[in-house]
A protein has these predicted regions:
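A conserved ligand/cofactor-binding region detector
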Residues: 1-755
């Protein structure tokens, strides 16, 4: 590609020198540059194409990431710096797309980056949500959900020109397709993220400051929000309408493109493979069958055989409530044709396997979406070694007995392009100097390990952490209005708010630490504990956990005895942009889910890659991190997954007994201390207190004492900075395993078989 001359581009576009342009106009200039460069990249064009269908794609801002992938980042940054401009400040004008919520969507985004980087032919397919999940605001120490108006003047969406009709039970809607380019790192080619929108969508249904809207106006509301509130019947119906709209469009697109590439549809599996990312896209199975039979004249049995050989399913959860189940009557209302096919598929499954545990439709006429994926897909994978073993041995064991050949593990991964190149350029530069630049394309960081005792390298590594903390402090001051001490230990838990992730346990530790400091035990370094994440609006206890955290933050900040030594911060509207600032700065990575409940996690990998030490239960991919770095370079605690499973199976866990332990009772009852309750919302705090002491379904009280002991050991170890930085280096050196390039290579070698 031709060299970049930003001076010349500035004159051509604005008739001014680069030095004279303000940051907004430079942002426009860079967007145009990236679009023009990306437009010259041809699409990957293998015979067989992947369709990665997902309800979420948490892609983050794209300007810097795309410049890295297109190979122009360093050149652009150098020219801007020479002209007196800061690329990070320019990036602030970019609006982050609101197309996802948490790990599921961020994983999908990392995967798209790696698929393109490996030169594989594959697109992501999802929906273009106008208001995302919601924008999080904190009012009176409580979460308030408001619409996330991200679309506005959007520079990244390109009209595809395609449009499809989607037939529901008693009406039809029309879609329109927009694309986002996904260039591959070091590749001359690209793929795309294909986002379907509702042609008749009406943003006017959404009042300016509320996420409440008319859920009955299906022909106008389908693409307004990700995961609309499903706490009532109409909300649940809307979810089904939305999912069917997504997969019907995806299936029509897939068939059209396969025909364009030469398929006669009898050989469709040679031209297309579908990866179902969690159960939201499950209805693509009956929809493909419907299209092949009713639209293209293929016999039903052959259509089933075709689809069975081209659909693969990734399971992302062990939580039974997260495996989607819909009433058959609701599916019949949304699409009678799809419901009829599901009934036929259930009959086939029951004829083949007379076991009610594996039925698609159970005795209550409830449709189990994951069961359909397993029976009528050719591959089922978990996302971490422990997670896959639990699926095989427990959660999906009846299916594993039937289809052992379908099951495999594909441990999650993250793209180093975003999580080092973009998020932590100082660390990227250090790695280049110490081990060369091959890691940028191979993901292999293992050469770093031989420098574990090199004092100069360790000092330089410590300097990158200091720089990352300075960037994070500036971000927190400007965006969150929070001042963080320059010498603070940065302790971070960022993930969606859920009881199984146990933010409530970290809150109990904060209470313990507060009381310990009040008793005169002052830490040598101040400790700043940072939370980030959203709670589903209908998830009351999760909302209560947020309220407890925010109330603790206020309580501690107002106590002059404690505030100099302990700080609690919850990031408002935590997103990818915030993650890129906070993760590189972290010293401690909190991965404290109840063992056996987290499928994998990917924030654990991002923190590890950026040199934070992991404080964790042996859950999800934490197990693999521990195996890689060794016991001396990670901090583990808590009941094992087998112990937890035994407690659930026997029904012997008793939160009340643990609550009566004096040390634990002191912490839990602090929540209902009259003075503390007066600071917060008494109803919320009382409800959370009662839930923890009486139910504690995810066993925070089981692990709290060992957690406190282990965390105090972490803080003590931090004081020996030479040993701490050695542990940091060893963690980074072993993080290459978690490159999404490795994960995608495994998917392709073992599942997709793309050319």
């Amino acid at each position: 590609m031709p060299q970049i001359n930003l001076m010349e581009l500035a004159e051509q576009s604005f008739g001014a020198s680069l030095e004279q342009l303000d940051d907004r106009r430079i942002y426009k200039l860079l967007v145009k540059l990236v679009q023009e460069r990306s437009a010259t990249c041809p699409l990957n064009n293998g015979k067989k194409k992947l369709y990665y269908i997902s309800a979420e794609f948490l892609i983050g801002k794209l300007l810097i990431n795309n410049m890295i992938d297109l190979g122009i980042y360093d050149e652009v940054k150098d020219q801007l710096t020479a002209a007196g401009h800061d690329l990070n400040k320019i990036e602030e004008f970019e609006v982050e797309p609101s197309l996802g919520n948490g790990g599921l969507g961020r994983l999908a985004a990392c995967f798209l980056d790696s698929i393109a980087t490996l030169g594989l032919t594959g697109d992501g397919v999802g929906l273009n949500y106008h208001y995302g999940l919601f924008r999080q605001r904190f009012v009176d120490n409580q979460q308030k959900a408001v619409p996330d108006e991200w679309l506005g003047e959007q520079d990244i969406l390109v009209d595809d020109g395609r449009s499809y009709t989607v037939e529901f039970g008693d009406f039809a809607v029309t879609s329109k397709l927009v694309n986002i380019d996904v260039p591959g790192y070091g590749q001359p080619t690209k793929n795309r993220l294909r986002l379907f929108d509702l042609a008749s969508v009406d943003d006017g249904l959404v009042p300016g400051s509320s996420i409440d809207f008319d859920k009955t106006e299906i022909a106008k509301n389908l693409t307004l929000f990700l995961y609309p509130d499903d706490s009532d019947e109409q909300g649940r119906l809307l979810r089904i309408y939305q999912e069917y709209f997504m997969v019907s469009n995806a299936a029509q697109l897939l068939i059209d493109e396969a025909v364009e590439r030469g398929s006669n549809l009898h050989d469709l599996a040679d031209y297309a493979v579908v990866q179902i990312n969690d159960t939201h896209p499950t209805m693509v199975i009956p929809e493909l069958i419907r299209l092949l039979t009713t639209e293209h004249g293929i016999e039903f049995d052959e259509a089933v055989t075709i689809v069975r050989s081209m659909v693969a399913y990734t399971n992302h959860t062990i939580l039974a409530e997260a495996l989607e189940k819909w009433p058959l009557a609701s599916l019949q209302k949304v699409s009678p044709a799809i419901a009829d096919i599901i009934v036929k598929l259930d009959e086939i499954a029951k004829a083949e396997h007379d076991d009610p545990r594996v039925a698609i439709i159970d005795e209550h006429d409830t449709v189990h979406m994951a069961h359909m994926d397993i029976h009528f897909g050719f591959s089922i994978n978990g996302v971490a070694a422990l997670h896959t073993k639990i699926l095989e041995d427990t959660e999906l064991h009846p299916f594993y007995e039937i289809y052992p050949e379908k099951f495999s593990n594909k441990t999650n991964g993250i793209t180093f392009r975003r999580w080092i190149h973009g998020a932590n350029p100082a660390l990227a530069s250090l790695l280049d100097d110490v081990i060369g630049t091959d890691w940028r394309s191979t993901g292999d960081l293992s050469k770093l390990a031989k420098f574990a005792d090199d004092k100069d390298v360790l000092e330089r590594l410590a300097a990158t952490k200091v720089e990352a903390k300075a960037i994070m402090r500036q971000f927190m001051a400007l965006e969150q209005g929070v001042t963080i001490p320059s010498n603070a230990i940065i302790d971070v838990q960022v993930k969606r708010i859920h009881e199984y992730k146990r933010q409530q346990m970290l809150a109990l530790y904060i209470i313990w630490k507060y009381l310990d400091i009040k008793n005169g035990n002052r830490p040598k370094h101040p400790v700043t504990i940072i939370f980030g994440g959203k709670a589903a609006p209908a998830y009351t206890i999760a909302q209560d956990i947020i309220h407890l955290i925010l109330t603790l933050s206020q309580w501690i900040a107002n106590d002059p005895d404690v505030a100099p030594y302990l700080q609690v911060v919850m990031i408002e509207n935590y997103n990818v942009t915030a993650a890129e600032r906070v993760i590189p700065a972290a010293d401690i990575s909190e991965q404290i889910s109840l063992a056996s409940k987290e499928a994998s996690g990917t924030s654990n990998m991002k923190f590890m890659l950026n040199g934070a030490l992991t404080l964790c239960t042996l859950d999800g991919a934490n197990v693999e991190i521990a195996e890689l770095v060794g016991d001396e370079n990670i901090y583990t605690f808590g009941a094992s997954s087998k112990q937890v499973e035994q407690l659930y199976a026997n029904g012997t866990y008793d939160a009340g007994v643990l609550y009566r332990t004096p040390g634990i009772k002191l912490l839990v009852d602090f929540i209902t201390n009259p003075a503390f309750m007066a600071t917060g919302n008494a109803e919320r705090l009382q409800r959370l207190h009662d839930d923890i002491k009486g139910k504690d379904w995810f066993m925070a009280l089981l692990d709290i004492e060992e957690y406190i002991q282990t965390k105090e050991r972490v803080l003590a170890d931090y004081e020996d900075q030479d040993a701490w930085m050695r542990k940091t280096l060893i963690n980074i050196a072993n993080a290459g395993t978690f490159s999404s390039d490795r994960t995608i290579s495994q998917y392709n070698d073992e599942i997709w078989h793309l050319n």
